Amino acid sequence: SRIGEPSLTSPIQGTITFIIYRRHGAVVSDTPFFSQLSEGIDSACRRLRYHLNICYLYENEDTEKRIDEIVAAGCSGILLLGTEMSEKEFAPFSRLEVPLVLLDCYFENIPVDCVLINNVQGAYLATEYLIRTRRSQPGYLRSSYSIQNFEERADGFYKAIRAAGMCASRSV
């Protein structure tokens, strides 16, 4: 084992709760991305000798009650997958005293640790690649679900279209 890392015989350090928030469940589902994310979290928790609880929280539930139950169960920290979450839906989590990291979501007005994908840059680079290799204007298929990630990807796409001197209105 490496210096500073607990060995496999070390006692459990605590419990991390991975909360998957689902507003409609259409975005956060059983896809390879979310499966790999869960597996990576599980692997890191085991390596660091933390027990992992996975909990689904739905929009129509009593969020504050569920949070209280999670904390009362002895939670050492929370990883919150907020892909489908709005700033208003995050509000009950802001009062927590246990460490919390927000995954795949960011709220400009709330001071919370986050782990994000750079959606704007990713969409920009992908669009730039398509323009360079296809030498034609790509189209953009947009989801009917409004989440921050999708808005950021659209922003990156349209920035690349404009940077290439193309008409954004033709990219329907």
Please describe what each predicted stretch is.
Residues 66, 88-97:
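Catalytic-core regions built around general acid/base machinery
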Residues 27, 85-87, 109:
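Glycine-rich nucleotide phosphate-binding loop and flanking beta-alpha elements
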Residues 2-67, 74-76, 158:
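Amphipathic helical "hinge" segments at domain boundaries
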Residues 18-23, 36-52, 77, 94-102, ...:
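Bacterial carbohydrate/catabolite-sensing allosteric modules
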Residues 8-11, 69-70, 93, 130-133:
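Structural motif
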